[in-house]
């Protein structure tokens, strides 16, 4: 008898720092992460976050979330030659044990982080995006909002990701309105996968 992995999909968003109907109109911008983290356990930090000259205060991020909250950080080829590589590496390092993964090619990871966090590196090609991934381990996925336009579509995405994942607790991130997360989470709990 083959034993299946027990799956509990953690749902999160591709970024939190944006205008979104989920946030109260009078919520200060600097409180968005804390507000988001009240209902979510993970966030994908997009590659654009690390560009623009000012490195984010990730120590403040850690203060805004609970100990169980996790950050998935994306880096791309733009970071390999960025003048602020050392500051980016320090900011990522400041996430400490709350850093769940660094999504980057080996070359970019090495250029920005050296050998730090090598065990957390996930190749971008290993991120599930709705189709089969030619990777030994699938623990992260991203789905665009237009793939979640009905309860049936949401169910199909959750089933496909659960089938593709190779770890007991994979993370699926939504690229779209934060309100979709609540609907997806409700359906996932009914299905027994979230």
Regions found by a protein language model. Give the residues of each.
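Residues lining hydrophobic/aromatic ligand-binding pockets adjacent to catalytic sites
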Residues: 1-194
